[in-house]
Amino acid sequence: MAEVRVGKNESLDSALRRFKRSCQKAGLMAEMRKREHYEKPSVRRKKKAQARNKKKRYA
């Protein structure tokens, strides 16, 4: 979980910006998007195989 401490003279906007950046670095937004809808394990495997084939094709 991302945590940001707000300084005495720090504006809320800059603290929010730092929080968003830390969430981005931690990969929370991508994880949230991935878990937004349930994905069956078979579909997950199929997508993983397609990504692997695509990567192999362009490598």
From Swiss-Prot:
Keywords: Ribonucleoprotein, Ribosomal protein. Gene3D superfamilies: Ribosomal protein S8 (1.20.5.1150). One of its GO terms (cellular component) is ribosome. It holds the Pfam family Ribosomal_S21. Residues 27-59 are annotated as: Disordered. InterPro entries: Ribosomal_bS21, Ribosomal_bS21_CS, Ribosomal_bS21_sf. GO terms for molecular function: structural constituent of ribosome. One of its GO terms (biological process) is translation. Residues 43-59 have a biased composition (Basic residues). Residues 31-42 have a biased composition (Basic and acidic residues). Belongs to the bacterial ribosomal protein bS21 family. This is Small ribosomal subunit protein bS21. The lineage of its organism: Bacteria, Bacillati, Bacillota, Clostridia, Thermoanaerobacterales.
